[in-house]
Swiss-Prot record:
Lineage: Eukaryota, Viridiplantae, Streptophyta, Embryophyta, Tracheophyta
Signal peptide: none
Encoding gene per record: HSP18.1
Entry keyword Transferase: no
Entry-linked Pfam families: HSP20
Family: Belongs to the small heat shock protein (HSP20) family.
Protein name according to UniProt: 18.1 kDa class I heat shock protein
Record keywords, A-Z: Cytoplasm, Stress response
Species of origin: Medicago sativa (Alfalfa)
Induction notes from the record: By stress.
Domain of life per record: Eukaryota
Length: 143
């Protein structure tokens, strides 16, 4: 396949005697932890997080808020059950646990966080406190 991309493994052919140095002990590019990308944007009303989680059901994803204003998004992609007669030619889809944590700013309304999942995209909305403009009162100057 001319459009396929195989990542070169510089350690593949080295006869390491210490298993701690083997290539399999290094983090893999396709691990779920690495591939869980999350966007964070701030609108005038809220902080909005979007995560692409293809193939996951909402029951497989956890959204949690910790006391110190930390938003945690975690879950697990399960490995496909393997039949002994199956021969795999390529495994590119990631599996395993993932977790991402974000410290929210002071203006986050921690008690009003909402999460929704649609078509494999998780959206977490954290409303912001309204910035109160100082009330200015004119004082009349007497003579």
């Amino acid at each position: 396949d001319p459009f396929s991309l195989d990542v070169w493994d510089p350690f593949k052919d080295f006869p390491f005697t210490n298993s701690a140095l083997s290539a399999s002990s290094f983090p893999q590019e396709n691990s779920a932890f690495v591939s869980t990308r999350i966007d964070w944007k701030e609108t005038p009303e809220a902080h909005v997080f979007k995560a692409d989680l293809p193939g996951l059901k909402k029951e497989e994803v956890k959204v949690e808020i910790e006391d110190d204003r930390v938003l945690q998004i975690s879950g697990e992609r399960n490995v496909e059950k393997e039949d002994k007669n199956d021969q795999w030619h390529r495994v590119e889809r990631s599996s395993g646990k993932f977790m991402r944590r974000f410290r929210l700013p002071e203006n986050a309304k921690m008690d009003q966080v909402k999460a929704a999942m649609e078509n494999g995209v998780l959206t977490v909305t954290v409303p912001k406190e309204e910035i109160k403009k100082p009330e200015v009162k004119s004082i009349e100057i007497s003579s």
